[in-house]
């Protein structure tokens, strides 16, 4: 049994005319049914493209191209859950360094042959997005199920951005409270929360108006 988040026709395609025409660039990728693919081009060396490939028959893995996608070579069997993660980010300075978003972030320093976890002490897990400062590759912003975190030392210490009230909502409902109805939402990893639709003060809604439902 294999879960694959794709189907016939899945693969990588390349355009050199701004999207007017496309060609497949799948030489070296698995010849079986392919699912979700995370891909990034190395700013340090644009000839290099990395791809993390979900595929049937346990043939997925981490792939590397050194000729702008014309051919691919499997570096390792590293994959994540294609239905929730599978995003990668190449370091803008070091062409051999790539970060994988997953429950816990991981990093390769040898072009995908081996990986180790990035330090995430006092940080929420389930990572999905990353920005690496092109002028200082120790400075990152990472988006995860718990919000946005910043580090200036490659993950040794993290700063949570408390002024950005972001989370993932799955379901929203309202009640019949008066004078203002409450809004409730079920979130990913962060309970079900509720709060008023309006308040009787000139400052408007603030974080203290929200509560965890029981």
Give short role names for the model-derived ranges.
Residues 1-214:
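Beta-propeller blade termini and top-face loops
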């Amino acid at each position: 049994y294999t879960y694959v988040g794709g189907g016939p026709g899945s693969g990588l395609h390349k355009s050199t005319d701004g999207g007017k025409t496309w060609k497949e660039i799948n030489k070296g990728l698995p010849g079986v049914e392919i699912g979700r693919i995370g891909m990034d081009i190395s700013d340090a060396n644009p000839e290099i493209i990395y791809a993390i490939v979900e595929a049937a028959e346990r043939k997925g893995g981490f792939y590397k191209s050194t000729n702008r996608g014309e051919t691919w070579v499997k570096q390792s069997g590293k994959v994540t859950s294609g239905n929730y993660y599978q995003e990668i980010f190449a370091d803008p300075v070091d062409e051999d360094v790539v970060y994988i978003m997953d429950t816990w972030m991981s990093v390769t320093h040898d072009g995908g042959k081996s990986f180790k976890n990035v330090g995430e002490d006092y940080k929420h897990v389930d990572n999905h997005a990353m920005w690496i400062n092109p002028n200082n590759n120790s400075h990152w912003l990472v988006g995860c199920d718990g919000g946005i975190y910043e580090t200036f030392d490659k993950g040794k210490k993290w700063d949570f951005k408390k002024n950005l009230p972001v989370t993932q909502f799955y379901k929203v409902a309202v009640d019949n409270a008066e004078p203002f109805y409450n809004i409730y939402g079920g979130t990913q990893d962060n309970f079900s929360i509720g709060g008023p639709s309006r308040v009787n003060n000139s400052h408007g809604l603030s974080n203290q108006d929200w509560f965890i439902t029981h």
